[in-house]
Amino acid sequence: MSSDFTVKVFFRGDWCPWCSGYLKDFNDQALHKIQELNGKIVGITSQVGNQSQKELGLNFDIQIDEENIEAKKYGIFITPKAETPLKDADGIYPNGMVQPGIVIEDTEGKILYKWAIIPSEMNLGGASERPLVRDIVSSLEQILKGQESGNSFNKTDMNYLEHNHPEEYKKVQAYIASLNK
């Protein structure tokens, strides 16, 4: 059975606690509704050897796009390998690291929704300030009904991560503490 649209979730990698929490949100909060609307979700990363689907128990596919072809197609920001947190790891991001983004595209290639982060110090290098999954689904429902969608979304932040994904929050806190040593 073919889908009417695809939700493409671009993420940095399985090492990123923000990405893990976000993928879990799509799996737990959006997958059923997206399927009801005759759509599908696919995660896209440029991390070679990514294990997110297996490690997180995701019920949607993960596509490894080490050339960043999909990211370039949609204008999703790509951090050069030398500037990635894993710059010293051989073969992990040979062509740079895709940053978080969401593209919802119909079967004819029409973009129904797009959001992409621009990494900065204020959003922890592209990790935080993602639109909440429930807001994306709500916006998609409006679009599919032919209504205009507002683009004001609540966004992920440290408080959100702490309350919704406490284990991932601890990883971020440990990373921040390591930077302050």
List each model region and its residues.
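Short, internal strand/loop/helix patches
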Residues: Q53-Q99
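Thiol-/selenol-based redox modules, centered on thioredoxin-like
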Residues: A89-K181
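Short active-site neighborhood of thiol/selenol oxidoreductases, capturing the structured segment around
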Residues: M1-F26, K40
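Structural microenvironment flanking redox-active thiols in thiol-disulfide oxidoreductases
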Residues: G21-K72
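A short local loop/turn or secondary-structure capping micro-motif enriched for an aromatic residue
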Residues: S2-S3, K81, S120-N123
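Short, glycine/serine-rich, charged loops/turns that create anion-binding
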Residues: D14, V48, P119
